[in-house]
């Protein structure tokens, strides 16, 4: 049975349990699917693997979906949008870029975007970055969490853009990653959402070695950190 299209309106019961939507396809024609829980006014958008060679966030977000389904009190007064695999082309090919060789996290319509061979022909030239932009426009999230991994030799950290300092520090209370303001990358989702739209956005930079962990180990290591983002400013239970 296919997932419903993005434009279809699910029932309240289905939204409570997590409604899947196909929101479009990648440049390589792979469906991109989000899961939406609830329909409350406090909105959190969590995405992973916009860089396909940073895969650890995908099983972490999928485990988050399982946790929400078994703890439906998290949905009270909230909408939670999960995008476990933002760059399926790169994920399959184990590369940073999509199938067209574009770094999706340099393809957003941010005021600091620069033209380069790997940033796309123009802002939002890629279907994946357009899809993420459309999700933001439709749901107007109160906060965005984008899961990444640092490169070999670089320590993991919690980066942020826009008015997200307090959120980043709250998340840091539940894991061993420090808050480290890395600076707004040109054309990144952080720059677009945090600086242009003034939406608090955290770039959660996990460690390179986290790719070697099982899904359960990832959840034990970082699950409560994601829950802290969802329940912010209330502490997670």
What are these regions (language model features)?
Residues 1-33:
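Short glycine- and acidic-rich boundary segments immediately preceding or forming the N-terminal edge
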Residues 22-24, 179-186:
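Short, Gly/Ser/Thr-enriched beta-strand-loop segments that form substrate-interacting elements
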Residues 26, 38-39, 73-76, 138, ...:
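Extracellular/periplasmic catalytic domains that process cell-envelope and extracellular macromolecules
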Residues 41-47, 54-182, 208, 213-214:
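Active-site/substrate-binding loop(s) of hydrolase catalytic cores
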